[in-house]
Amino acid sequence: MSLLTEVETPTRNGWECRCNDSSDPLIIAASIIGILHLILWILNRLFFKCIYRRLKYGLKRGPSTEGVPESMREEYRQEQQSAVDVDDGHFVNIELE
């Protein structure tokens, strides 16, 4: 005798929805929160690189460049840009021989 014949299978009545009162405000609120959470999660996954780069580098104000020669300002800008460019490589490819 196989195991499949000994397992009880639920009847059609067992799969029916038991929450007939779907106009309950708690159920509606939970549904709205769930949908909003899903939308925000999808947007986060789509734009996380832009969002976190903006948070990491965009909100920080650099040191004041008052009284600093233009050549040093340009050097500082290049260093900052190279730091941003390096940050693009979150994922590293490792090749095994």
From Swiss-Prot:
Which residues, per the entry, are lipid-modified as S-palmitoyl cysteine? C50
Site positions (Essential for channel activity, possibly by being protonated during channel activation, and by forming the channel gate and the selective filter): H37
Glycosylation sites noted in the Swiss-Prot or TrEMBL record: N20
Please give the activity regulation comment for this entry: The M2 protein from most influenza A strains is inhibited by amantadine and rimantadine, resulting in viral uncoating incapacity. Emergence of amantadine-resistant variants is usually rapid.
First-listed, main subcellular location of the protein, grouped into a coarse class: virion
Q: Where is this region: Disordered?
A: 60-83
Q: Which residues lie on this side of the membrane: Intravirion?
A: 44-97
GO cellular component terms attached to this protein's record: host cell plasma membrane; membrane; virion membrane
GO terms of biological process kind: protein complex oligomerization; symbiont genome entry into host cell via pore formation in plasma membrane; symbiont-mediated suppression of host autophagy
User: What further fact does the record state?
Assistant: When the channel is activated, one or more imidazole moieties of His-37 probably become bi-protonated.
The function of this protein is: Forms a proton-selective ion channel that is necessary for the efficient release of the viral genome during virus entry. After attaching to the cell surface, the virion enters the cell by endocytosis. Acidification of the endosome triggers M2 ion channel activity.
Q: What is this protein called?
A: Matrix protein 2
The species this protein was found in: Influenza A virus (strain A/Fowl plague virus/Rostock/8/1934 H7N1)
Top-level taxonomy: Viruses, Riboviria, Orthornavirae, Negarnaviricota, Polyploviricotina
| Gene name as annotated | M
